[in-house]
Every structure is written in structure tokens, then in C-alpha cells.
């Protein structure tokens, strides 16, 4: 038995202890592994599987590999379209040894259009550290080709495409919207497009969140390497920064970002910024910085209408290499009226259920999946949100209006702020008035919820699960 076989088998042993049997069978079993130059390469059967593992299982995989290799082996995942001629091992031998009869997806009857399966290997290194490395043209997840344009986002889409033109009318774009409506998609699409059309072999592109920007700056201060930090972000062709609202109240970081944007605009570079809030809604942000935000083009993104949702569902199904019938697409579009992440999640669950049951996607199956997301009796207002959140947290709704700073009350209130902002037409001021809080308190609370979810901390995962449960079972989004 080779070292590679031993390594992968040990990793699988560890993963079986960490993951549920169903998760291991569906996502880990189809992988093929090989080792080269001290790295473990994992080959997924499709782009969908690779992206799913990248988003949900990479922490478990990297921890298991680190445990087995003593922290010496790095991990990369690719689509199995051109596996190199290296010693490989799939779960076939491993499962035979362990007497596990299942070693991949069942032969499914789901309609598949092979023209939608990527023919190129897309390699994505599984991140280990907090700070992202600069993106290359091969590591962008989203592109303009996969963005569905509708009345809700056509202006933002046109503005984003304008950013990659030589004749761009502005050099700064500020995108704002509620969570899950396409800000990240458009931001990455700008980066991907610039990398593809640039006449330079390696255009300088920086893509990160405002929190990661802060972490980089703090690290440069600790290592006394501020000049390197400034050189990295001020000498770039395209600067993509998400979640600007994280910088509220952080004066030093605002000064650094202001200097960075000034430098970039001075050298003719392009800047794309995103936030859950429009510049005028930001609090405790330097007026000079807000002025810089407003000096470019401001574009908001709204919730998609039924027709746009239908087209998004069809497009997301193509990512899974599945052809969705018009009837099922229309049904889902009418029932799922939340954000785009909800549409993605429903399609993922629908496809996975069809594969696990080895059957075609039918209207009955769609209705079963929809039942996890909506109720037959729709209701949506601040009162229903307060009722649902207080019940989920085991708190009396009346006490949420108090001035208590106990952690449970703070998290529950912030969750209400987040849901009200995301799923109602209430302004930040109106939400604050309901709880006798200031506009800035509501904004800060929403930002804290988003930050914990993005960090995927224990608290963040708990909040995300609570939000998911509430949105599926207690609230009909409209």
C-alpha cells in the first residue's frame, strides 16, 4: 500500500467521524485523491460538487489532512476533467476495504444537459488563513455570463460592466443591497472579466472584505511592515472591497481606506465597493470617505420579481447540470420570494433529493422541498418577526424592548433588526423607533450579525441556523 493510499484512507477515517453518513457518502465518496510535491489534490466529479465542498466542507477536510499529515500537507480541489497522471486513489478501494457498498452518486434519472458541465479544470486552493490571497483569473466563482439581469438589478449590472471598459465613465462603483441579492456576484464578475480581457499577463487585482482589509492593516502594524501593506493595496489595477459598513466607528481604518482610494483614483485604477447600506445610511464614517463613495456611481439592487426569480432558478439548475421544467420553475418562482441565496438553497436541495432517491424532479418533489421554506398562510411584518425570534430564543417579546444588554437580548434584537431590514420595507429609522433605539444602533446590530455569519464562528453558525430556521418555518418572505 502506498503512502498516498494510507494518507487518504486516514483522512477518510477522520472525516467519517466528523461528518454524517449521508454527507460522507454524497460529497466525500466521489472524490479522487492524488499527491504531488507535498500537496493533496482532490478531484470532484463536477463543478457543482467542487463549489459545494469548497463552501461547506473545506474546514473539515483541511483539519483532517492537517491531523493526518502533522500540518505539513496543503490541499487543493479541482474538477475531475483532466486528472494528471499521478498515483491516485478513489473511495472505491477504500470502501471495499471498509465494506461500504456506496461509493458515489447513484445513476440518477434527473435530466442532464452536458453542455452545461465545465470542460476546463478550475482549481481553487482551500483557504487556511483568514486573509484571502489575491484572486487569479482561474479562481473567480462568479462571472457576468451567469448573472441573471432583471428590473431589480439592470442598472447595477450595467454599471459593473462599464467598470471593465477602457472608456469607463467613472472609476469607482458603490453597490448596495440587502443580503443575498447579488453584490458579491457582480463584484467578482468585474474581477473575473478584467483578468480575462487585460493585456497584462497578471493584472493586479485585490479582492477582500473590509474586515480582512482591517486584519491586513493590523498585521502590518504588528510586523512593522506598513509600507508593504500600502504598496499591496495602492499599487493595483482593480480594488474590490466588500462590506464597507464594517468600518463604521473605526477611525484609523477609515483614514487608511481614504488614503488608499485617493491613491488608486489618482493613478487611474478602478474601485468597486459594496455594502448592505447606501453611503447616506452609514453612521460614524468620515464625511470625506462618504464623499469618495459618492464621487463614483451608486447603484442599488432590489429583490427580484417573479419572472427574474424564474430565470435565476433555471440558471442555478444549469450549474447542477440539470434541466428544470417550466412548470417546476414557475411553481418555485411563485413560492420562493426571498433572496437569491434562498433560490440557490432550494435548487440544491431539490437536485440532491432527486439524486439520493434516484428519481426525476417532479412537481410533487418540488412541493415537498418548498414546504421547508414557506407556509401556506403568508404573513410578513415586524410583529411576526418579533414573535418568531422571541420564540426561537426563548425570550418574552416585551423584554426585547428593554434597555437590557444581556447577550441573549442583544443577539435576539440584532436578529430582528437583520430580518426586518432584509424582508420588510422598513427603514433603519423605523426599525429603531419600534425598539426606542437610534438609527446607528440598528445599523451596528445588523453589521454584527453579518460579521458573525461571515466569520462562521460558533456564534455565527448558531445565528445562521436560527435565521435559516426562522425564514423556512416561521416567516413567508414577500
Swiss-Prot record:
ATP binds at residues 180, 182-184. Residues 137-354 are annotated as: Domain III, AAA+ region. GO terms for molecular function: ATP binding; DNA replication origin binding; lipid binding. CDD domains: AAA (cd00009), Bac_DnaA_C (cd06571). InterPro entries: Chromosome_initiator_DnaA, Chromosome_initiator_DnaA-like, DnaA_C, DnaA_dom, DnaA_N_dom, DnaA_N_sf, P-loop_NTPase, Trp_repressor/repl_initiator. It comes from the Bacteria. The keyword ATP-binding applies. GO terms for biological process: DNA replication initiation; regulation of DNA replication. The keyword Cytoplasm applies. Residues 1-72 are annotated as: Domain I, interacts with DnaA modulators. Residues 355-478 are annotated as: Domain IV, binds dsDNA. Keywords: ATP-binding, Cytoplasm, DNA replication, DNA-binding, Lipid-binding, Nucleotide-binding. It is found in: Cytoplasm. Its main location: cytoplasm. One of its GO terms (cellular component) is cytoplasm. Disulfide bonds: none annotated. Oligomerizes as a right-handed, spiral filament on DNA at oriC. Plays an essential role in the initiation and regulation of chromosomal replication. ATP-DnaA binds to the origin of replication (oriC) to initiate formation of the DNA replication initiation complex once per cell cycle. Binds the DnaA box (a 9 base pair repeat at the origin) and separates the double-stranded (ds)DNA. Forms a right-handed helical filament on oriC DNA; dsDNA binds to the exterior of the filament while single-stranded (ss)DNA is stabiized in the filament's interior. Domain I is involved in oligomerization and binding regulators, domain II is flexibile and of varying length in different bacteria, domain III forms the AAA+ region, while domain IV binds dsDNA. This is Chromosomal replication initiator protein DnaA. The lineage of its organism: Bacteria, Pseudomonadati, Thermodesulfobacteriota, Desulfovibrionia, Desulfovibrionales. The gene is dnaA.
